[in-house]
Amino acid sequence: MNYTPNSTEVKQLIEGVLQRHFGCSAKEASRDQMYKATAITVKNILSDKRSAYKKKVNEAGAKRVYYMCMEFLLGRSLKTNLHNLGLATAYEKALKKLGFDLEDLYECEPDAGLGNGGLGRLAACFMDSLSSLDYPATGFSICYEYGLFKQMIVDGIQVETPDVWLPGGEVWLAPRTDRTYKVRFGGRVKEEWKLDGHCEILYEDAEEIEAVPYDMMISGADSAAVSQLRLWRARNIQKFDMRLFTQGQYTQAVEQSTNAEIISKVLYPSDNHTEGKLLRLSQQYFLVSASIQSIIRDHMAVYGKLDNLPEKVAIHINDTHPALCIPELMRILVDDYFFSWEKAWDIVTRTVSYTNHTVMPEALESWNEDLFRLKLPRIYMIVKEINERFCREAWNAFPGNWSRISQMSVVGYGQVRMANISVIGSHSVNGVSELHSSILKDSTFKDFYRLYPYKFDNVTNGIAHRRWLCYSNPGLAELLDECIGTDYRHHPESLSDFAKFADDATVRDRVRAIKHDNKVKFAKMVREKTGKIIDTHSVFDVQIKRLHEYKRQLLNALNIIGLYLDLKENPDLEMQPQTFIFGAKAAPGYDMAKRIIKLLCMISKDIDQNPKIKEKLNVVFLENYSVSMAEALIPSAEISEQISLAGKEASGTGCMKLMINGALTIGTLDGANVEMQEAVGAENIFIFGLTANEVEQLWLSGYRAANYYISNDRLIRIIKYLSTGFAGESFADIAAYLLNNGHGVADPYMCLADFESYYQTHKAMIDAYANKDVWNRMSLLNIAAAGKFAADRSIEEYADRIWGLKKVK
């Protein structure tokens, strides 16, 4: 097939799809039909290209990576695919001839409801780079019918509604009903020894659910490779019960199907109750069981044996959600292919690798042992055996130290620990920034590091720089093309050449003009969607990340309240106008995160009611923040808020997207901020607050938030005003949370300890903004230093040091 059709050929392809799929001509087609027809033609090109690439991989006998993650935050596909394939211009011309505007069609596509935050966006960026670099790769996740949720803000309160994305997004999915697999839950397990010496595993009263794959193609930029993202939908194996239906028992007739299909309805269901925990566990096992069965089937079709699995397959666990792939692969090798335990374990531990994404204790997943045993009886038996053998190994390493061994065990204190089995069953364990990897070795997994020092590695995260710079910010990309050529599009380290222009006033002025144009575009989008007016001459100060206490949107809010009170006291105060922009979703069961959202929304509402204050201070909370919204916002941002409590953020990638688009960072020495400072220089980033070591020492010595409160008049004023509140609502509960939490330590993420440093650093940043030449120079140098943080670099490191992949072109 022709992978690079010209505009005439594209026009013919679209007209053909319109006729076959919708029975209409271009003149009769609606905008939605034209979008879907366009998407189908692109999907067909990608599918053919994928088939050709897969044939090359099979002929080469190349090793493949299978990347498992509970979420992939893809955003929209049409624009990225057209740019990656080099077809954007051809499609634009073809659609113009057909009476449609390509930009309008981009707006028809919903963001794919397959992800939530940084974990899913990282997975999406990595799939993009794997394709662009010609590495054989398949991603695995679940095809969530209703995504995470669609966020609505009603009177400042987050309301979760279903994210109905499939009507517009399903056009990118190819159902593979010929590749379904059975996944078993519950029941009882019996062992029956056969005369030939092998043990047959029998299941009684188990619930069987069918996993149906839906494939999405992931394009690469100017590459031979097309990666595949395989998404699983749950379907009941027991067909519709006609007998019950004819008796009028309609609900009962469909009950089994409904119960089975719940597994693939929603990403991260609330786990504040037993039912939610069971559903999450079911989702995780459903994902890994279907995926491992698929991997084994594909491998056997090419090689006919499994002894060579580690040489031909790399299975990567992205965080602990897919950790059950370790016992599931053991189950298949031992139960279905009759490998000895020792041989099977050798294969597993040379095939699987694990990336840790958090040091937060609540995110290091564990499951109630009784619940786990009831839901996954065979997997529980295997996990117990893994645990017993590991404990014997650990005893030899740490004789007599049962306390240490019990902390390292997979099963202990009534819990089954996913992080521990991930470390034990993987040949590589990596963190996602230098600081994070050090914390893993020195604290989180320190005992494992003593036992397996050779397993631990670091691969700092990266972003799909073509998407976040070239496609999202075409004005800046055009300037870079003129100044340093186009090599940076495929070799992002070449961005460093842009630093040569730091003292070129003409280039600095163009950087500033491009930023202002992007601010105008974003403000226009916000006004059209919400009616809210943003002053494009104000500083765009941006904090965009999921709402969590450790990310400290609350610290940002405290500073905003201080500015609000300054203006309330003196409306004529000379101040650089500032617009604070937030994009964040709170987990449905996370009450404090929801209160912080309400605080931000009420501050915004209060400011809207005070026109004099709004001239200099504005707060914008973006409802239902998404990837497509980020693509408009990030190029317009001038200040990037990366203010997590030091030692809590593993890496962060939003900071990298903002940096590569010329925003200046205010942040703690946490996550990737440390390496960003090294890359751009301390003089071009605004660092404040406690370090990770200082945070640890403060905890050990006894943190008392009240000490910081009583010694800071500005803080006293701000926190007292929380009780007065905004737009008629008091936030005395947040004041209490900061000062005298009745359920633990007050101010657990040290907002008060870091407040003065944050306030002074932010003030210095606004002062620097007044000197346009200095600010634009710093902005330019941030762009030039951002090449290190491209996903292409991350993937090359994974491929070389962890997966052992070779490129297939």
Can you say where each PLM-predicted feature lies in the sequence?
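A conserved ligand/cofactor-binding region detector
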Residues: M1-K809
